């Protein structure tokens, strides 16, 4: 068990899954993930959520170690996604079915010295989600909110993997997150205990501010993401020329090769930066599939409030810009640059003026 200290009477009993390669069977997690669970020891004992079925034995070992022959009185179920609910079926509380309590907004559970206040958080990011505020030690048990990828045994900066987690897991539900943040703003919070990632104790305003920015679909950084989907490398060559020009102008720029790089990280950067340039090759009368996949993901996650430039490549009938524009148009508050670039198979000197005009426009 990770040596995570919360308090004398609130214990961490979660587990790391350092060997997991894909979270939700789609998101690369090179440093694994943690499944967090907590135990409140008081006159009444409460277990806060279970963990994924991959870690059943380890979790029960952690639980038994802290219980020391005591028997839990309550199991709090904040979120029914299987990575947190898989072990409810094995949790032996006598007469559990008859003792199920459906709680409502603002209701409290008296454990003795500790009191849990229940706060509903529907669609953050599942319909049934709730969070709990422990009034004595002023701890917010935030369910998947404020979570991040990465096992706790792997020490790393919070923001990058928390951002990638947020925009790919929770990002579609900005409005419900805003509602939860408003509720949380009325509480005196000293610690945040999520179901994934580290316990947050210091400088909580930093983490809350990030969630305010992310959930309101503001751009976290002024800058440009250049995203390329190139078949034979020629479209990528042009995209990298654009990257160089932007850097020469002092613009903060990120580049992603959609054919090779982590798509979830590309989605993260698309939301992070204020502007984006898409460089896509024409394919089968449309746009090359990695770009199409990327734009579908942005549609589903609520991409909005951005400026986007378009670059296409096509040998006979370039159509990528039209397809990309058609996919962007339904998105909310997207400004598409008037200047576009069309490459016929390979870059030629005559293309440079159009590239320069697009870069100038995206910079202003």
Language-model segments: residues:
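Active-site neighborhood of phospho(di)ester-bond hydrolases with catalytic His/Asp-centered motifs
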Residues: 48-50, 72-80, 89-91, 140-144, ...
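Metallo-beta-lactamase
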Residues: 4-8, 89-129, 173-179
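Metal-dependent catalytic neighborhoods of phosphoester/phosphodiester hydrolases
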Residues: 86-91, 204-205, 324
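Active-site metal-binding motif and surrounding structural segment of the metallo-beta-lactamase
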Residues: 43, 54-91
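FMN-binding flavodoxin-like domain, especially the glycine-rich phosphate-binding loop
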Residues: 152-192, 196-199, 219, 241-256, ...
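Short acidic active-site motifs
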Residues: 87, 262-266
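Short, charged N-terminal beta->alpha structural module
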Residues: 227-249
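Conserved beta-strand hairpin/beta-sheet module of binuclear metal-dependent hydrolase folds
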Residues: 3-63, 131-134, 138-142, 235
């Amino acid at each position: 068990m990770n040596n995570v200290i919360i308090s004398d009477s609130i214990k961490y009993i979660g587990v790391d899954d350092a060997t997991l390669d894909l979270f939700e069977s789609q998101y690369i997690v090179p440093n694994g993930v943690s499944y967090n669970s907590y135990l409140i020891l008081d006159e009444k004992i409460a277990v806060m959520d279970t963990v994924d079925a991959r870690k059943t034995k380890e979790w029960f070992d952690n639980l038994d170690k802290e219980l020391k022959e005591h028997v839990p009185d309550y199991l709090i179920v904040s979120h029914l996604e299987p990575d947190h609910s898989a072990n409810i079926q094995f949790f032996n509380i006598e007469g559990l079915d008859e003792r199920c309590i459906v709680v409502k907004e603002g209701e409290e559970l008296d454990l003795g010295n500790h009191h849990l206040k229940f706060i509903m958080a529907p669609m953050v990011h599942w319909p049934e989600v709730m969070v709990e505020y422990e009034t004595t030690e002023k701890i917010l048990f935030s369910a998947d909110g404020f979570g991040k990828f990465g096992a706790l045994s792997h020490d790393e900066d919070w923001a990058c993997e928390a951002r990638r987690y947020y925009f790919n897991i929770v990002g579609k539900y900005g409005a419900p997150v805003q509602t939860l943040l408003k509720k949380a703003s009325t509480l005196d919070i000293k610690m945040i205990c999520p179901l994934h990632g580290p316990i947050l104790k210091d400088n909580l305003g930093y983490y809350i501010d990030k969630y305010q920015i992310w959930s309101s679909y503001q751009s976290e950084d002024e800058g440009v993401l250049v995203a390329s989907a190139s078949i034979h490398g020629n479209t990528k060559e042009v995209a990298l020329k654009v990257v160089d020009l932007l850097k020469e102008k002092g613009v903060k720029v990120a580049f992603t090769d959609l054919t090779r790089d982590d798509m979830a990280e590309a989605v993260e950067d698309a939301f992070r930066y204020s502007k984006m340039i898409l460089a896509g090759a024409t394919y089968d009368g449309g746009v090359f599939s990695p770009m199409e996949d990327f734009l579908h993901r942005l549609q589903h996650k609520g991409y909005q409030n951005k400026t986007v430039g378009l670059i296409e490549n096509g040998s006979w009938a370039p159509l990528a810009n039209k397809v990309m524009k058609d996919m962007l148009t339904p998105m909310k508050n997207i400004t598409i640059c008037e200047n576009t670039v069309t490459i016929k198979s390979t870059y030629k000197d005559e293309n440079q003026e159009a590239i320069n005009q697009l870069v100038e426009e995206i910079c202003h």
